[in-house]
Amino acid sequence: MRFPSVALDTLIDEFAKLPGIGRKTAQRLAMYILHEPKIEAEQLAKALLDVKEKVVRCTICQNITDVGTDPCAICASKARDRTVICVVESPVDMLAFEKTGHYKGLYHVLHGVISPLDGVGPDDIKVRELLARIPVGEASGVREVVLALNPTIEGETTSLYLARLLKPLGIAVTKIARGIPVGAELEYVDEATLSRAMEGRTVV
């Protein structure tokens, strides 16, 4: 059943395209927007446009940052431990580790994991950019790379692939400790568990 308004139905269709949003939820969101003051709708529209126009990827770690703030705040900070790089799948996973307040090193965001079934290979994620941060035969300063990917089949496959590439570079390659349920997503794991996983990391 559709509303007798093309504009409203179009908005519902657009909301329904979002991950985790079914049509009923999309209808509730659209009706909420419809009954809010026009200024609220304008602010939402501006925020949507701004995130597409003003958010870029840090040229060093590939994390998200604002235009004009590259490198990102973490890469630019002199307080971070530059000898350690924690590799994560997404910016959301990076944020999960930051919330613990325990990890003080740098990050590298892959923006995905290797998944042959989905047609995603090493060239489709930020592997080359990671290797470029640890040049062979040069004093990059990096002493350890921590593989902190989600405990899924794809995450494990990606970790094994990265370990094979990184070990010959003469650095320590470690992995966050087990304790996170298989198939779980790091963004939903509590901070205490993430902290223990990072502190108890093991050599790959």
Curated annotation (Swiss-Prot):
GO terms for biological process: DNA recombination; DNA repair. Belongs to the RecR family. Pfam families: RecR_C (PF21175), RecR_HhH (PF21176), Toprim_4 (PF13662). PANTHER family: RECOMBINATION PROTEIN RECR. A zinc finger (C4-type) spans 58-75. It comes from Chlorobium chlorochromatii (strain CaD3). GO terms for molecular function: DNA binding; zinc ion binding. The keyword Nucleus does not apply. The gene is recR. May play a role in DNA repair. It seems to be involved in an RecBC-independent recombinational process of DNA repair. It may act with RecF and RecO. This is Recombination protein RecR. Residues 83-181 form the Toprim domain. Keywords: DNA damage, DNA recombination, DNA repair, Metal-binding, Zinc, Zinc-finger.
